[in-house]
Amino acid sequence: MMKVRLFGLIVALGLVIPPARADWPTSRGNAQRTGNVDGQPGPKSPKILWVQESTDHYVSAPSPGKGMIYAPALGTLNSGVLSALSTDPAAGAKRVLWSKSQPFLKLPTVCSPAVVGDTIIFGDGMHQNESPMLYCLDAAKGTAIWQMSIPGPLIHLEGTPTVIDGNAYFGAGNGGVMAIDTRKVTLDGKDMAAGDVEKIIATKWKELQEKYEADKKKDPDFAIPPSEDALPKPAPKLLWQQGGQGKWHVDCPVVAAGDTILAGSAHLDAENSGDRALFCLNRADGSIKWRADLKLNPWAGPSVGGDTVLVGCSSIRFDPKEIPGAKGEIVALNLADGSVKWRKDVAGGVVSPVAISADGLAIYTATDKKVYAVDAKTGAPKWTYTAKAPFFGGVAIAGDTVYAADLNGVLHALALADGKLQWKLDVGSKTKALGNIYASPVVDGGRLYIGTCNIDSQEARKTVIVCVGEK
C-alpha cells in the first residue's frame, strides 16, 4: 500500500524517475555493436566539453559506466594502463578517479572493459604476448575482486568479454573461446561467492595500510607502501573452453545470441596457427553448433541483428603501413545454421565490427576511406560516404545519426537515413594534439567519447580523450 501511495505522489507532483543505468556487457554495448545502449541521441551541434591529456595511446574505445568512462591504453614501452575518468565537465584536475598500471597489470591492455552492475571485467595481452590475466574490478573504486591467469603461447585477451546471466565469454587468442562463472571464485582451495571474497580482500588491505602507517611512525625512510600484489588473489570458476591449443585464434570479441555464442577465429600465416572460420557454440557447454569458413580473417568479429549474423573480414590488422592493397569482405549468415545469406567484397580492410541499426541497416567502415550502409538482410546498398582518410574504427549509431572517426583524427556525423554529412570535427586541431584515431566512438548520455593515439610516431606526443556534447 505504501508503494502505491508513493507512486501516486510521484505522479501527482510530476516527478521524473531517471531510468536505471544500462550495463555495457559486451563489445560496443550490445550484439548489434552500435556503441550506444541508452537510446539517447548524440550531439547535433558539436562542442568539446572536456579534454583529458596524456601520452598514453588510446587504441581502443572507452566503456561507459556510472558517471565515468573506463579507458584502456598503451603506456610507456607498451605497458598496460586502465583509467576511470569522471564524465563531469567540471571535474578538471580531478578527472582521473583511479588508474591501474604496472605492476598490477602485467601486460599491454587494449581490451575495453565489460561493465556489469558494480563491476568491470577486462583482460590484458596483445599480439605476440602470452599468459595474460583476466581481471574483475570494483567499478567505483578499482579494487580487485578476482583475477584469472591463462598460461600459454600466443594467448592474449584483446576483445571485450561478453557477460550474460553471470557468466563471461571471451576469446583468448590461441586459447580459443573460454567461459567462466563470474560469481563463484576459488581462494586457497575453497569455493566461495565473489561477494564474500571482497570482504576478505578489504580486510587484508586495511591490515596492510595500518602496518604501513605504523612503519612510517617508526622509520619513514624505510616504510614500504602496501602493494596489491600482497592481497589474496581469488580466481573465477572455468565453465568450458573450446578451440584451445592453437586450434582456433580468437582475438575479436565474441557475441551472445540467445543460447549461443558466436566467435570469429583467424588463421595466423606466420605461426601456422588457428582456423579461419566463424563458429556458433552452445552457450551452456561450448559444443559446436555450426561453423562457416571465411576467405579473410574476421578481425572485426561478429554482430547480430535478428536472425542475421554479420562478420567483417580483412586481409590486414591495425597497421597503417599495410593499408595499400588491403582487402575486405562482409559476410551475412543465417543465425540458425550458418548458411550464407549474402557476401560483399570491400575495397579495403574491415577491422571493426559492423553496426546494425534498429531499422535494419548494416553500417561499416573500411580502410578505403569509406563508410558503407547496406540492407542487413539482403546486402543491397543504401548509401556510401567518403572521407579523406582511412578508417580503422567502426561507427556508433545514436538516434538518427551515425558517428565515425578516421585515422587522421576527424570525427564525422552522418545522417542515418542517407549518409549525408551533418558535421565534422577535427579532434587533433581542436585539442592541439595531432594524432590518429584507431578506436570506435562511444555515445552515452547524449555525449560522444573518443581517444587518440600516436602509436606509429617516433616521438612522444600528446594524446587525448575528448568528450563531445551539444553547443
Predicted ranges, named:
Residues 1-8:
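Bacterial N-terminal signal peptides that target proteins for export
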Residues 8-16:
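Bacterial N-terminal signal peptides
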Residues 17-22:
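Sec/Tat signal peptide C-region and signal peptidase I cleavage site
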Residues 23-31, 55-83, 104-135, 148, ...:
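Repeat-blade elements of multi-bladed beta-propeller folds
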Residues 29-39:
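Short, tryptophan-glycine- and acidic/Ser/Thr-enriched carbohydrate-recognition patches
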Residues 37-55, 94-96, 231-244:
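A short helix->beta-strand "capping" segment at the edge of beta-propeller domains
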Residues 49, 93-97, 143-147, 188, ...:
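A structural motif specific to WD40 beta-propellers
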Residues 86-91, 138-141, 182-185, 282-285, ...:
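Short loop/turn segments that connect beta-strands within beta-propeller blades
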